[in-house]
């Protein structure tokens, strides 16, 4: 998961549990989360999943070169473990944490809160923190090492917190050979690149532009309901110019004619179907078309950071 903007979850919007402005629960096996912008969430910035949810999905996770801004009551936490053979492993490298107007004073310098206690873990007779490798993270412009990690998330945990923290440390990056990025930027460079390129759009809309500017300016905050300010949180977007798509296959006629010319007379427009492999043996025609739409969106340096 890369270059996404995850922003402004709704804090008081009628959830049965009350306050629920949360960023997300991130987990998986051999999963990489890099160059994402997480902004304006009360908690779960993100929350790493618990290993008891699925023993086959306990990591490792690379959490690399992300930007986390304006957490409210908590920043990153989670990754609790329910057995010695089911340990959750997370590599946190080159991430940039920046407190905002909503960040409570007691957590302004908290990069992460360790989590060991959970009801499901206790029921198995074993509960421990995950294992974390920390390197080159920043929080509010300062080095974010283990001194910026608190323990424990649950008030029900009665074990020695210093021992829990010591047991959570990994001396080296946990690897399986499957998830590593070839290039890991400094946290400062990642901050600049995320604010420049993040967002699932060729053109940023008013909301994405506002979120990025708020990160730069140190402004904005948590919201309760979109209806509190529809113009700001859910603006009407002006329609763009649609493509000409005579055969209604999702691909621009001009692009199809260009590709047919390259292929020669052996392929007609009716044969250049979205799910066919006329242009490549590896990618469908539609995949190639969609890739060409965004091929110039990122500079080569940013593309290199996305390559495994």
Predicted regions and their residues:
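Non-transmembrane alpha-helical segments in soluble domains
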Residues: 3, 34-35, 212, 252, ...
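Extracellular calcium-associated, cysteine-rich motifs in secreted modular proteins
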Residues: 228-308
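Active-site proximal loops enriched in glycine and acidic residues that flank catalytic Cys/His/Asp
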Residues: 50, 78-80, 94, 99, ...
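Glycine-rich beta-solenoid repeat tracts in large extracellular/virion proteins
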Residues: 13-17, 22-27, 44-55, 74-84, ...
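Right-handed parallel beta-helix
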Residues: 1-16, 22-48, 55-73, 89-101, ...
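Long, ordered, amphipathic alpha-helical scaffolds
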Residues: 97, 101, 106-240
């Amino acid at each position: 998961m890369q270059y996404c903007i995850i922003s402004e979850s709704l804090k008081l919007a009628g959830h049965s549990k009350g306050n629920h402005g949360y960023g997300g629960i991130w987990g998986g096996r051999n999963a990489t989360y890099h160059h994402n912008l997480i902004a304006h969430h009360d908690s779960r910035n993100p929350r790493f999943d618990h290993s008891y949810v699925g023993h086959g999905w306990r990591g490792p996770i690379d959490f690399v070169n992300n930007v986390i801004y304006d957490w409210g009551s908590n920043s990153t936490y989670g990754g609790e473990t329910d057995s010695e053979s089911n340990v959750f492993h997370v590599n946190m490298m080159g991430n940039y944490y920046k407190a905002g107007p909503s960040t409570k004073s007691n957590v302004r310098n908290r990069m992460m809160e360790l989590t060991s206690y959970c009801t499901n873990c206790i029921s198995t007779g074993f509960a421990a923190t995950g294992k974390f490798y920390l390197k080159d993270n920043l929080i509010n412009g300062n080095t974010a090492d283990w001194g910026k990690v608190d323990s424990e998330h649950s008030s029900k945990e009665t074990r020695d917190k210093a021992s829990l923290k010591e047991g959570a440390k990994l001396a080296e990056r946990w690897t399986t050979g499957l998830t590593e990025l070839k290039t890991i930027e400094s946290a400062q460079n990642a901050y600049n690149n995320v604010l420049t390129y993040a967002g699932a759009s060729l053109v940023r809309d008013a909301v994405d532009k506002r979120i990025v500017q708020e990160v730069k300016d140190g402004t904005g905050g948590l919201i309760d309901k979109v209806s509190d300010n529809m113009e700001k949180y859910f603006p009407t977007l002006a329609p763009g110019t649609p493509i000409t798509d005579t055969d209604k296959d999702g691909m621009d006629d001009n692009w199809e004619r260009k590709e047919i010319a390259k292929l020669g007379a052996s392929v007609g427009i009716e044969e250049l179907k979205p799910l066919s492999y006329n242009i490549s043996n590896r990618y469908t025609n539609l995949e190639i078309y969609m890739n060409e739409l965004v091929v110039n969106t990122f500079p080569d340096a940013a593309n290199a950071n996305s390559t495994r």
